[in-house]
Regions:
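A short N-terminal helical cap/helix-turn-helix that marks the beginning
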Residues: 10-32, 50
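Active-site-adjacent beta-strand anchor residues
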Residues: 12, 73, 118
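Residue-level signal for pocket-adjacent positions within structured domains
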Residues: 4, 26-27, 38, 92, ...
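Structural core segment of the AMP-binding/adenylate-forming
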Residues: 18, 61-62, 89-118
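A detector for short, charged/polar N-terminal pre-domain segments
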Residues: 2-9
Length: 118
């Protein structure tokens, strides 16, 4: 007897799937964010997904492997979004570090987490 698969997903459920879904089904929808520099940045889900894939490739070139930890030290904006999705798409563990912390605190957090990349 064959197992019934019903409508079960045939792919792993990953955070990066959210951005891929948006790029496929709402490719031209704009993502709008205000940059630290003060201006407004606009691009599409298609562009964001492409840049997240490039971030994933950069992590691979840096020697990151599935399960490695990477830290972001960034303000909340489009660049942070790309790093977040690029890391999760590479099966990396991504955590944020508050840029307002003192350098000693940032170093302690990154060392304690055993980050591969900051």
């Amino acid at each position: 007897m064959e197992p019934l698969t019903g409508r079960m997903m045939q792919m792993p459920l990953m955070i990066s799937s959210l951005l891929l879904h948006a790029a496929r089904h709402a490719a031209d929808t704009e993502i709008v964010s205000k940059r630290v520099e003060g201006d407004v940045h606009r691009y599409t889900y298609r562009d964001a997904e492409l840049r997240a894939r490039k971030a994933a490739q950069a992590f691979a070139r840096l020697g990151c492997a599935a399960g490695d930890r990477v830290a972001t030290l960034a303000w909340n904006g489009y660049r942070h979004l790309e790093i977040y999705y690029g890391a999760s798409g590479s099966q990396l563990v991504c955590h944020t570090i508050n840029p307002r912390l003192f350098p000693e605190q940032i170093a302690w957090i990154a060392n304690d987490a055993e980050d591969r990349v900051l």
